[in-house]
């Protein structure tokens, strides 16, 4: 029991004393006053309690904590308690200083590093690719009942597919015999009818097989050209799902009772129906972000600034809404497992192993999984917008990140004229600019960014017109109305020519808008090197060396048939092109690459899927460009992009990108310093790029 009579005088003088007792602990005294006088060091009672002379100083403000009392069981020593033992004074002050600095500096350091990491690695979406892949793996059935249910679903789906494709399987040996008798040509009437029937059955089989046919049409390295050409006509004749389903998905996703709470107008008729999803147009009440295509806004977004929230944007905005079909994920998952089983079965045949069908099914499945999760398309659009920021002639629709889920993609509605309308009329003052713009966009994707749109057919490209400069935050009213675009899309050739001339006189300029970015291609370092080496070989007509390089760098070198003959065929192909070419600008790179892919198939030279997709993109863009402007010089368009990429890469003469850039620069110099006739003569006589 402690007597506190000693403290009465201090309490009367204005000191406040509090004691916090606890069993098996120490007492702590907190003395509060505006200032505290020096305690008499001769006071024996104080010395008996404290065990030492007090180190308090006059006029010490606020609280003083005394925690080292002898002969008394006090609290466990607090971490911030200051010790007053003279012997430990310097050590305690040093520890206190270290603790204080640590607890003050550490939160700011960690927080600052986290902010820097977020700004540097920020993608304009709340999801990353790793998170999406984790989400896909988590959707797989884990329980025994789920696996049993999935097994029976696979059996039912297999039976359904067997009924659909049984006529194809039964007639296949007969068709193979006819093809063999006609010297392996698939151009006969019977085979053509069979191929059209195959297309019909693929359309009946559903989304997976529609996409499978479209994918096979791009793999000229695996299938005959006539087969690929027929499959390229495959379209998704899918019945649109009901409006009620779309409304239920939107209400469930956005947690509203009706779509009128979000949209002012909602067009119930879809503007596009695909194998996996369909697209509507609507007017949103409050835009989730202030959609702005200006360079300044894009620059701010690239360094981490987010756009305004929905509550800050009172204006309406026209949007496009992509909604997945019901149960499409379930059916595609079942189909991929069935395809994987049959791919492994076919791979057991020795003559079919070079195709590596199980690997191709994995690549095809990864492609479909990207399209089944609309977050991927939003990520791709954001990346394309970042890559092309400041480009006045190329646009991508801006996705609304806060409104995008794996089932719904909300993005800007982009009015415009389909590029197919320009290809149909084939005349106009903007054709040359459109052809060069498309090629420039392709080379930036392929060479500079290594992030290429993998579905560049004309249906996914629109043309918008701006007056002088594109729309910015300072200039909003320089764009043509959507109704005018619809009229132009359906007008006759005479009306078309007149309208284009009038737009040109008024100062309007075209801008390409790329849609449907669900699929992209990224070449690995080795694939990019192979592509540039092949591109350089085509330019310099070194066919034999290019053929040997393709064989050496293929995935299954041991399965290649007649390596030397393949290299000789490459040399013969480029020699024939060299002799028949009137000028270098008339080189059709896409056609040459397609011939190379055909020879690779005949000799079992294994080509990577991304490499094949890149060749397909070049074929599509070059084909459309030459229809618009037959005199287009593809190689001249590639030169500035190779120059830019070479300056950023390893500047070495062994770098294929640097070599290709030097070759194109030399060609440009020759064209400027001599006549075209002289250059063409040098090319034909093999003086510029001799074959050794």
Curated annotation (Swiss-Prot):
Signal peptide: none annotated. GO terms for molecular function: kinase activity. Its main location: mitochondrion. Belongs to the protein kinase superfamily. ADCK protein kinase family. SUPFAM superfamilies: Protein kinase-like (PK-like). The keyword GTP-binding does not apply. One of its GO terms (cellular component) is mitochondrial membrane. One of its GO terms (biological process) is mitochondrion organization. Residues 1-91 form a transit peptide. It is a multi-pass membrane protein. It is found in: Mitochondrion membrane. Keywords: Membrane, Mitochondrion, Transit peptide, Transmembrane, Transmembrane helix. CDD domains: ADCK2-like. The chain crosses the membrane at residues 96-116, 161-181. This is ABC1 family protein C21C3.03, mitochondrial.
């Amino acid at each position: 029991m402690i007597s506190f009579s000693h403290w009465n005088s201090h309490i009367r003088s204005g000191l406040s004393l509090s004691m916090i007792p606890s069993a098996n602990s120490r007492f702590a005294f907190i003395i509060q006053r505006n200032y505290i006088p020096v305690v008499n060091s001769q006071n024996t009672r104080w010395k008996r309690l404290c065990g030492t002379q007090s180190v308090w100083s006059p006029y010490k403000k606020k609280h003083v904590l005394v925690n080292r009392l002898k002969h008394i069981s006090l609290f466990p020593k607090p971490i911030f308690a200051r010790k007053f033992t003279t012997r430990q004074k310097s050590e305690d002050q040093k520890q206190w200083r270290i603790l204080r600095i640590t607890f003050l500096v550490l939160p700011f350091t960690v927080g600052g590093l986290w902010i820097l990491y977020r700004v540097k690695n920020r993608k304009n979406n709340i999801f990353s690719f790793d998170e999406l892949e984790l989400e896909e793996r988590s959707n797989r059935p884990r329980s025994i009942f789920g696996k049993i249910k999935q097994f029976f679903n696979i059996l039912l789906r297999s039976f359904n597919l067997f009924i659909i494709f049984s006529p194809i399987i039964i007639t296949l040996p007969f068709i193979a015999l006819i093809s063999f008798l006609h010297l392996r040509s698939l151009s006969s009437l019977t085979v053509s009818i069979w191929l059209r029937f195959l297309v019909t059955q693929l359309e009946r089989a559903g989304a997976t097989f529609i996409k499978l046919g479209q994918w096979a049409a791009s793999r000229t390295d695996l299938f005959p050209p006539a087969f690929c050409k027929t499959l390229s006509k495959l379209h998704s004749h899918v019945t649109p799902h009901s409006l009620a389903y779309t409304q239920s998905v939107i209400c469930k996703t956005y947690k509203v009772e009706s779509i009128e709470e979000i949209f002012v107008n909602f067009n119930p008729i879809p503007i596009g129906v695909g194998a996996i999803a369909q697209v509507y147009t609507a007017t949103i009440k409050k835009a989730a972000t202030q959609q702005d295509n200006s360079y300044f806004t894009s620059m701010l977004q690239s360094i981490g600034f987010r756009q305004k929230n929905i509550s800050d944007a009172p204006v309406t905005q026209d949007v496009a809404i992509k909604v997945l079909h019901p149960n499409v994920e379930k059916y595609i998952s079942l189909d991929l497992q069935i395809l994987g089983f049959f791919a492994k079965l076919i791979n057991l045949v020795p003559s079919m192993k070079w195709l590596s069908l199980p690997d191709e099914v994995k690549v095809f499945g990864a492609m479909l999984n990207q399209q089944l999760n609309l977050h991927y398309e939003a990520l791709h659009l954001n990346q394309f917008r970042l890559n092309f920021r400041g480009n006045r002639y190329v646009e991508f629709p801006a996705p609304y990140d806060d409104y995008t889920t794996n089932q719904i993609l909300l993005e800007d509605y982009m009015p415009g004229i389909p590029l197919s309308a320009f290809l149909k009329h084939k005349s106009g003052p903007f054709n040359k600019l459109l052809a060069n713009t498309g090629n420039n966009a392709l080379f930036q994707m392929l060479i500079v960014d290594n992030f290429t749109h993998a579905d560049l057919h004309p249906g996914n490209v629109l043309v918008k017109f701006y007056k002088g400069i594109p729309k910015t935050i300072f200039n909003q009213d320089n764009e043509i109305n959507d109704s005018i675009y619809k009229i132009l899309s359906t007008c006759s050739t005479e009306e078309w020519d007149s309208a284009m001339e009038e737009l040109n006189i008024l100062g309007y300029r075209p801008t390409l808008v790329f849609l449907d970015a669900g699929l992209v291609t990224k070449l690995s370092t080795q694939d990019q090197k192979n592509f540039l080496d092949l591109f350089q070989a085509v330019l310099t007509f070194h066919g034999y060396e290019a053929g040997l390089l393709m064989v050496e760098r293929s995935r299954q070198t041991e399965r290649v048939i007649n390596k030397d003959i393949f290299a000789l065929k490459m040399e013969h192909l480029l020699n024939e092109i060299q002799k028949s070419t009137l000028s270098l600008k008339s080189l059709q790179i896409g056609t040459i690459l397609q011939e190379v892919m055909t020879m690779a198939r005949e000799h079992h030279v294994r080509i990577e899927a991304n490499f094949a997709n890149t060749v397909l993109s070049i074929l599509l863009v070059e084909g459309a460009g030459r229809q618009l402007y037959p005199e287009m010089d593809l190689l001249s368009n590639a030169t500035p992009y190779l120059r830019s990429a070479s300056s950023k890469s390893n500047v070495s003469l062994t770098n294929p990108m640097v070599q290709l850039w030097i070759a194109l620069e030399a060609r440009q110099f020759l064209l400027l310093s001599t006549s075209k006739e002289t250059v063409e003569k040098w090319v034909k006589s093999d003086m510029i790029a001799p074959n050794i």
